[in-house]
Amino acid sequence: MGRGKIEIKRIENTTNRQVTFSKRRGGLLKKAHELSVLCDAELGLIIFSSSGKLFEYSSASSSMKKIIERYQKVSGARITEYDNQHLYCEMTRMKNENEKLQTNIRRMMGEDLTSLTMTELHHLGQQLESASSRVRSRKNQLMLQQLENLRRKERILEDQNSHLCRLLAEQQAAVEGVQEPLLEFGVFCPPPDNKTAAAANAGPLHLGHHLPAFRLQPTQPNLQESSIVPNRPVLQL
């Protein structure tokens, strides 16, 4: 009878898993050696066990380092060591650039000028003049913007003032329109002010002269009052 197929899945038993790993690792290394010798192949094999132990194999005509370097050239991949070296070079470049910028700032502030040559001083002067010109240009631009804002506010205030003047003229015309009919009856109404407004609120408006009071008397003698105030006219019905 033939052997049954083994299901490919993780072996849960630790002892059985270690025994199987040892057997299959040996078979894999044997196959790698045979492939390298029979086919003249440059071969590298790296194995890590579940416990982290390293096992490796490389062709007799080469080494693991040479195989990895060749792999990097062909695939373009990088190992951490090379990445760290590239990062160190980049940090060094940025540090030098930062120091150069700090030196330029100090020189623009008028410091550390003793080591500069005449050509370098002339170039520094041109840089300062260019920077000063840009500062003046920006300053003038801001001043023009502020002036335009003030002019805009002035126009707004003028429009508001014109609107208020129109409202005042309309109110004045309305008051004069009310006074004209009253003048026909001999009534004069001065323009309203604080005093006249207070007087208007204090009591009713009295028109012309006071008229004498009249009393109504019935025509029947028996309904007339017994006493009539003398010198007062009596209106007969």
Curated annotation (Swiss-Prot):
GO terms for molecular function: DNA-binding transcription factor activity; protein dimerization activity; RNA polymerase II transcription regulatory region sequence-specific DNA binding. Keywords: DNA-binding, Nucleus, Transcription, Transcription regulation. Expression specific for female reproductive structures: strong at the adaxial base of the cupules, where ovules will later develop, then in the outermost cell layer of the nucellus, in the inner envelope, and in the inner half of the middle envelope at late stage of ovule development. It is found in: Nucleus. GO terms for cellular component: nucleus. One of its GO terms (biological process) is positive regulation of transcription by RNA polymerase II. PANTHER family: SERUM RESPONSE FACTOR HOMOLOG (PTHR48019). Probable transcription factor. This is MADS-box protein GGM13. It comes from Gnetum gnemon (Spanish joint-fir).
